[in-house]
């Protein structure tokens, strides 16, 4: 991915009409705004920000994840932009100077590389993806699919024998 990102249409990366309509419907039903910008950002800086926040604690990590998601899909902002990401970090009270240093030092590159290698090993070819026990679910899935996978995961020999 080039640092400036790329066009989804030009590189045939856009969602299918069916998937896009499903995502829009789910967002509408949940009361969430959903923009689908053509620009696909290089998200390395955003992922680094997320890892910085993970190390700062669960509460900050969750808040940062939500703010990044809202910036992209709620407001259509470029997650490859340092200014956008520093604005997100500042709005959450995060240490923007240390985050800038983390980017410059490539502090979380090894960790992000390990996540990427694990995803490739598991066969993740697209996002979103969820690994539920030994079942890999790739792509946007209805709630019931995830619920059913969790149900299968929760079956133990004892519960199978008792019928629970």
Model-derived features with residue positions:
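C-terminal cap of thioredoxin/glutaredoxin-like
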Residues: 59, 63, 67-164
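Structural alpha/beta surface segment adjacent to cysteine/selenocysteine redox centers
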Residues: 1-75, 161
């Amino acid at each position: 991915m080039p640092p400036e990102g790329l066009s989804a249409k030009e590189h045939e990366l856009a969602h299918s009409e069916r998937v896009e309509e499903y995502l829009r419907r789910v967002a509408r039903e949940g009361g969430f705004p959903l923009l689908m910008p053509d620009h696909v950002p290089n998200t390395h800086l955003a992922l680094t920000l997320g890892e910085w926040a993970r190390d700062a604690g669960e509460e900050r990590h969750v808040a940062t994840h939500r703010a990044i998601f809202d910036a992209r899909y709620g407001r259509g902002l470029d997650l490859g932009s340092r200014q956008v990401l520093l604005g997100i970090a500042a709005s959450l009270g995060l240490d923007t100077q240390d985050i800038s240093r983390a980017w410059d030092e490539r502090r979380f590159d090894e960790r992000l590389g390990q996540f990427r290698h694990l995803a490739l090993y598991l066969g993740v070819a697209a996002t979103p993806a969820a690994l539920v026990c030994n079942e890999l679910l790739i792509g946007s899935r209805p709630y019931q699919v995830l619920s059913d996978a969790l149900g299968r995961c929760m079956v133990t020999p004892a519960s199978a024998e008792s019928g629970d």
